[in-house]
């Protein structure tokens, strides 16, 4: 189990829908009875209440609201089960071989499973292709409903770790206390995934240690390309006689 870290995939599909022009941040997201009945962390959405997609994203990223995550899943997918099918399909595309999603918010459910490696894969996809997520997950406090609802970020590393850029925390009885933490310093970007901690203090300490190790032991560097490096390679029995090479 990975608790609310699940919401990274929910967010990834949402931002992909935004990029494709299928939805916009100003769209109104309706609240169903199903979303209303979500337990755990929430912003106490009422059936029929209408918030913009932008507001729902704030609730998900800052306060880890389960009701908002399910409302968005229903808005994007038509229903939560259909959206979860898309989550699993996307996980397969990304090579997340040990992941199965059963819901869009991360509440404990039989068969809802993943690994630290798979969480890192989807976190990387989110951060690389949709860096605008940082505009949401690095906000410490915000409000909704004209100031009536206060949002406080569940990621305490925002207040204590230099270069932190996100990403998502999670806590349930079966999953324990979890985090997928991301940070950037001097063009080096790292992701640290901690699952199954016994407390928030342990979770943040473990993530801090992992990130500290990464920044101490690695650096970003450009590899020089030799002037005589081949530009193409010959292809035998292929549709094209040569294959162009590029350095990335």
Features from the language model and the residues they span:
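Active-site-adjacent loops and short helices of periplasmic peptidoglycan-processing enzymes
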Residues: 1-120, 124-129
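Domain-terminus/edge residues, biased toward the C-terminal soluble/receptor-binding domains
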Residues: 96-100, 108-113, 117-248
């Amino acid at each position: 189990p990975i608790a609310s870290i699940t919401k990274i995939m929910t967010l990834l599909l949402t931002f992909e829908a935004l990029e494709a022009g299928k939805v916009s941040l100003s769209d109104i997201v309706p609240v169903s009875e199903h979303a209303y009945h979500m337990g755990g962390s929430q912003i106490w959405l009422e059936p029929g209440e209408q918030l913009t997609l932008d507001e729902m994203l704030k609730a998900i990223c800052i306060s880890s609201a389960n009701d908002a995550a399910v409302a968005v899943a229903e808005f994007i997918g038509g229903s939560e089960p259909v959206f979860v099918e898309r989550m699993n399909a996307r996980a397969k595309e990304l090579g997340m071989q040990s992941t199965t999603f059963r819901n869009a918010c991360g509440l404990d459910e039989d068969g809802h499973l993943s690994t630290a490696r798979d969480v890192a894969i989807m976190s990387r996809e989110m951060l690389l292709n949709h860096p605008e997520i940082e505009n949401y997950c690095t906000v410490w406090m915000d409000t909704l409903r004209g100031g009536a609802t206060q949002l406080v970020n569940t990621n305490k590393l925002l207040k204590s770790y230099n270069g932190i850029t996100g990403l998502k925390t999670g806590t349930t009885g079966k999953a324990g206390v979890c985090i997928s933490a991301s940070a950037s310093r001097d063009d080096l970007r790292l992701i640290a995934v901690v699952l199954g901690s016994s407390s928030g203090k342990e979770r943040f300490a473990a993530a801090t240690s992992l990130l500290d190790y990464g920044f101490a032991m690695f650096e970003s560097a450009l590899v020089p390309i030799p002037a005589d490096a081949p530009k193409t390679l010959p292809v035998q029995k292929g549709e094209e006689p040569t294959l162009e090479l590029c350095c990335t």
